[in-house]
């Protein structure tokens, strides 16, 4: 099991190639930088083009709303900054367009860097759908930031085409065992989008904690979202003790997402071409639900109790359990589009 610290260290390590200043003195061709590797890419090390730090981007009038929204996301990510729309194509540093008929998921794109007079670079990015143009820019983030100089970017000219091999490119974040704040989830989404991952699988419930507000069952989060911190700081499921009452003063580790916070995460991820997929564990791995609502148990054991006590499967034969499942799913459908 990877804990939160390891998870973020891995994300930081993966993102190094996309951070300003991460480039080497030698100019790196696109095929040596891009991760994942594009479908096809060709560079010319002998022809280096130069781009300013703050790129002026041209788009046809019909595409301006799409491109402007995309540049706002890129500026917010902070790896490239100062991206702006220009109406003057001749002076643009990058030319973007959405054209053609989308095939498959519409995530494919083409990109090339040309070298003009006095070594001036011009980026050309083309896709048949907005999501393809988004991924074209994520590739440019990687290539440009790996070739940053003091005054801008110096990059070997290239031409590339990219179409995803897999439609579902996902990562699972277990927020039940180790809670991640909204800000931390957003940071993870940014790292995912940089590397063209498009599904965030949120493991919202398990024995160690329930992490999403369900308005009809408030004890799920007022009790089962909190547990007593482990003394040595190491993960040990057998030692997990959930709050035995609301506002238990000993149960200080944990947290949960309100439904509005989850909608905020979903919208943030959607703007970065990431779909959030919720997971609610049933009928097993349900100790957190049973802990808060004892009528989900077959043998009538009084809950809450401390620790796992060997039981983590709800009783699917009871009308109360079926009603609980339906109610939870109904609220999930209202939150997740």
PLM region spans:
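Residue-level detector of intrinsically disordered terminal segments
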Residues: 1, 23-26, 222
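Acidic, contiguous N-terminal accessory segments
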Residues: 23-169
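Bacterial N-terminal signal peptides that target proteins for export
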Residues: 1-11
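Generic recognition of cysteine residues
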Residues: 6-7, 41, 96, 298, ...
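Feature activates predominantly on carbohydrate-active enzymes
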Residues: 102-312, 316-337
């Amino acid at each position: 099991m990877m804990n939160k610290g390891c998870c973020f260290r891995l994300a930081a390590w993966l993102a190094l190639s996309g951070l300003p200043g991460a480039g080497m003195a030698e100019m790196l061709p696109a095929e040596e930088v891009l991760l994942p590797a594009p479908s096809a890419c060709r560079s010319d090390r002998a022809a280096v083009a130069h781009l300013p730090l703050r790129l002026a981007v041209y788009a046809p009038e019909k595409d301006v709303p799409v491109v402007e929204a995309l540049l706002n996301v890129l500026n917010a990510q902070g790896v490239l900054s100062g991206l702006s729309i220009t109406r003057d194509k001749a002076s643009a540093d990058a030319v973007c367009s959405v054209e053609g008929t989308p095939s498959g998921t519409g995530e494919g794109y083409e990109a090339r860097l040309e070298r003009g007079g006095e070594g001036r670079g011009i980026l050309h990015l083309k896709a048949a759908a907005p999501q393809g143009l988004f991924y074209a820019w994520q590739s440019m983030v990687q290539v440009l930031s790996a070739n940053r100089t003091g005054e801008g970017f110096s990059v070997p000219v290239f031409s590339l085409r990219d179409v995803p091999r897999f439609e579902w490119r996902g990562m699972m974040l277990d927020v039940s065992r180790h809670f991640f704040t909204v800000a931390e989830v957003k940071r993870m989404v940014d790292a995912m989008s940089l590397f063209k991952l498009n599904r965030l699988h949120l493991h919202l419930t398990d024995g160690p904690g329930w992490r999403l507000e369900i308005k009809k069952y408030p004890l799920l989060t007022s009790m089962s979202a909190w547990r007593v911190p482990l003394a040595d700081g190491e993960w040990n499921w057998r030692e997990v003790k959930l709050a035995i009452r609301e506002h238990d003063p000993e149960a200080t580790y944990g947290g949960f997402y309100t439904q509005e916070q989850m909608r905020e995460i979903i919208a943030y991820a959607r703007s970065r071409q990431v779909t959030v997929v919720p997971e609610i564990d049933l009928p097993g791995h349900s100790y957190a639900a049973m802990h808060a609502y004892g009528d989900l148990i077959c043998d009538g054991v009084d809950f809450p109790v401390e620790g796992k006590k060997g039981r983590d499967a709800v009783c699917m034969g009871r009308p109360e359990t079926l009603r609980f499942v339906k109610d939870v799913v109904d609220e999930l459908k209202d939150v997740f589009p």
